[in-house]
Amino acid sequence: MGKITRLIILFLALLVTLGLSGCGGGGGSSAPPTGALNITIVDGTTANPQKGIAHARVILLDAESKPVQTYVTNDNGIVSQSNLPIGDYQLKISAQGYNSSPPPRVPPLPVKVKQGETTTATIELFPIDTNLVVGAISGTVRSGGNPVAGALVIAMGAGVSYTTISAADGSYVLYNVVEGNVDVTAYIKGLNFPTLSAVTVTADTTTTAQDLVASGVANGTISGNIQFVAGGTAQATDVTLIDRETREVIPGMRVYTDANNNYTMSGLPNGDFEIIASMLNDGNVIDPDEAVTQGDPLVTVTDGVVDPSTRSFKITGAVVMDTPSTPANNVVPELTATPTFTWHSESSYSSASGFAIEVINESGDAVWGGFGGLDPVKGVPTVTVSGGTYTIPYAGPALQPGRYYQLRIYAMKDDNNLILYPNGYKLISVTENLDGVFKVK
């Protein structure tokens, strides 16, 4: 073999070696930086201090709330995952016999994975009412033969609802469903699903193979515009479709207004919904007086026909809370069991003659204040402070350590139009939908 031939062979061998070592099958790019996650799920009651909960279902979501992976805790209540790409994630946890975490209306729990580090977290679950006789339902959500990840799965029976989301492999489990018959369906942008009627739930048993297979493409469309009034900050604003009964967000059904404050939302599935503007924390809320002047923003979709097909909103400035106030990263603040709530004046409600106070629990029930069990537009507030007062100490039933609550503050203005406002006032602002959530130390 000649010298030149040998050099060519060596050169080619070197190229192959460099190519194999550099590409790693990824077209020349190196592997992304990774970290690890170690999560422990424990019983939050004093009767079982830090007892690990076995077989809890932990759904890991990305920063956009899309499922990444689903885990089941071991006998010690632990799940571990190495080699996770670094970044921001969220967690949703559920288990038979326990309330889910986070509860409804509370954003998923945020966690951050850092390069070369193990992020650890201990999350408490609290038992459900021991008088309840419950089972579970499981299945998969599919479109044809493909799994559908991130679909909202809802079971309804005897006026009670149960929700979860499908995992990355399309699987779902609805825990703690009261014994009896329920109807089960799923929602996600762009797909319609049938309802599984009268699914039988038996105590201490999982009713399996309740698969939800898409029946077709969803193509409903709704549009409208936003008008900013009374201190509302003009900005791109979210418009969100939620389930009318559970008030859970329909996955994929959130859009933002354009430069002219218009929006168009497409892919609406069949069902009965509510459409909300400025649901996210952005300093604005829907003018609460709209419920009086326009009615609730309800939407019904039937095979692509949306009624109504247009809906516009007036947006005002929200009542701004100081304690508690949920920061932008959605880390829920912790308060003592006897907190003092504070807020401050803004132009959108500077003319308020008073403020109504409401503290709700994880089930959405008022534990202090509120409107006598009625809608804020129709009821009479039971805990109030006068205009110009921006603080009130909590004086309701004992708040439970480890549990979540939400403070709602409604700005009221006297109005003598008793036809529209039979209680002598109208609402001119309110705290944001996702603000005011706190956990008791």
Q: Language-model segments: which ranges?
A:
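Bacterial N-terminal signal peptides that target proteins for export
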Residues: M1-I9
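Long luminal/extracellular ectodomains of secretory-pathway precursor proteins
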Residues: I9, L18-K441
